Regions:
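Structural element of the ATP-grasp superfamily
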Residues: 99, 187, 224, 317-318
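A conserved pocket-lining segment of Rossmann-fold NAD(P)-dependent short-chain dehydrogenase/reductase
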Residues: 81, 155-174, 198, 202-213, ...
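N-terminal Rossmann-like NAD(P)+-binding domain of SDR-like oxidoreductases, especially those catalyzing
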Residues: 1-203
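C-terminal substrate-binding subdomain of Rossmann-fold SDR/epimerase-dehydratase oxidoreductases
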Residues: 228-352
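A short beta-to-alpha transition loop/helix N-cap that caps and shapes the active-site region
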Residues: 37-38, 120-123, 210, 280, ...
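Hydrophobic alpha-helical packing elements
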Residues: 13, 58, 62, 179, ...
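Hydrophobic alpha-helix immediately C-terminal to the catalytic Tyr-X-X-X-Lys motif of short-chain
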Residues: 182, 186, 190, 220, ...
Length: 352
């Protein structure tokens, strides 16, 4: 039986992985730091060891006999402002570095890492000449004028988005994104130095039951849900035509189980996505229709640092892991409209 250390086991995605593992031939050692910013003060989770991945001595103890680490522990979300940077660096990057050092000391050579699509930055686009273009970040002047689409840096013409593949340029645009790319870089260097194996799963927009309620660190689907529960119209930024890939948490858990069971060499990054593009406006409308709530409000406002379109190719994950999402966004979001959410007792900013 494969013995797995699961970090972040009390979190949204970690909890679903823990549930999925019960139906597989895996022995799970579940740990979580139970940060107040995520779980509230004094929170505990049944069957989960209270452990911070920055504590190397405790990690080495629980790593004895572990075959694979499934590393979900992280401070998540785009953040509120630059003051969040130390928390991301401490929990995500330093925490991952400590974990990798502890794995080396304990003789554990396989890692499944929760990464994110945010490492791609603006994504990939096609210009009118059929050339692939990596656009510059959108300017405040264009956004203020309601010009939301990415434009060719030379001609100024609007660009068409392309599916993002794993070998696309990595250009993080937020503190959180920078921390996720740093995690990948540490893990890749560790794999080279130790001969270990890393599968970095680049999650796209994850949603599903027990997602945290409306906080600045929640996903947009949960924020739309929270507005509808209060009888308010979901507020959609820009023109609502931003394309994304929404992937159900049950599929994300399945991708992790498949990665734990796979035996790959070196460092491999894989998109975890539904393979079905959908716009943010469509997400809001599906949820509003399913709940019989108010029509979403397209605000025309924007958030600095948001990317316009980011939609993934699912081909490599299917080829490498045999993983293919089973829940398409329209069906999954309709069910999510009435799914239970987790009360976010910890609504403050993450702390170092």
């Amino acid at each position: 039986m494969t013995r797995v250390l699961l970090t972040g086991a009390a979190g949204f995605i970690g909890g679903h992985i823990l549930d999925a593992a019960r139906d597989s031939d895996l022995e799970i050692v579940a740990v979580d730091a139970m940060l107040e910013s995520a779980h509230g003060p004094g929170a505990r989770a049944d069957g989960v060891i209270d452990l911070d991945v920055r504590d190397k001595d405790s990690l080495v103890d629980v790593l004895r006999g572990v075959d694979v680490v499934c590393h979900q522990a992280a401070v998540v979300g785009a953040g509120v402002d630059a003051a969040d940077a130390p928390a991301y660096a401490s929990h995500n990057d330093y925490g991952t570095a400590v974990l990798l050092a502890a794995m080396y000391e304990a003789g554990c050579s396989r890692l499944v890492l929760a990464s994110s699509m945010v490492v791609y930055g603006e994504g990939r686009y096609l210009n009118s000449s059929g050339e692939t273009v990596i656009p510059r970040p959108r300017t405040r002047a264009d956004l203020d004028a309601g010009l939301f689409d990415n434009r060719d840096p030379i001609s100024g013409e609007p660009l068409d988005w392309l599916l993002v593949e794993e070998d696309s340029t990595l250009e993080p645009r937020s503190t959180y994104a920078a921390s996720k790319l740093a995690q990948e870089n540490y893990a890749s260097a560790w794999a080279v130095a130790t001969g270990g194996s890393v599968i970095a799963l680049r999650y796209h927009n994850v949603y599903g039951p027990h997602m945290p309620r409306n906080t600045p660190y929640s996903g947009v689907a949960a924020m739309f849900r929270s507005s509808l529960e209060l009888g308010r119209a979901p507020t959609v930024y820009e023109d609502g035509k931003q394309a994304r890939d929404f992937v159900h948490v049950h599929d994300v858990a399945a991708a992790n189980i498949a990665s734990i069971e796979a035996e790959l060499d070196g460092f491999t990054a894989l998109n975890v996505c539904s393979g079905q593009p959908i716009t943010i406006g469509e997400v809001a409308t599906i949820l509003a229709d399913a709940r019989g709530g108010p029509t979403p409000e397209i605000t025309g406002r924007y958030r600095a640092g948001d990317v316009r379109h980011i939609v993934a190719s699912s081909a490599l994950a299917e080829q490498t892991l045999g993983f293919r999402a089973t829940i398409m966004p329209r069906d999954g979001l309709t069910a999510f409209a009435d799914a239970p959410l987790r009360d976010a007792e910890g609504t403050g900013p993450p702390r170092v």
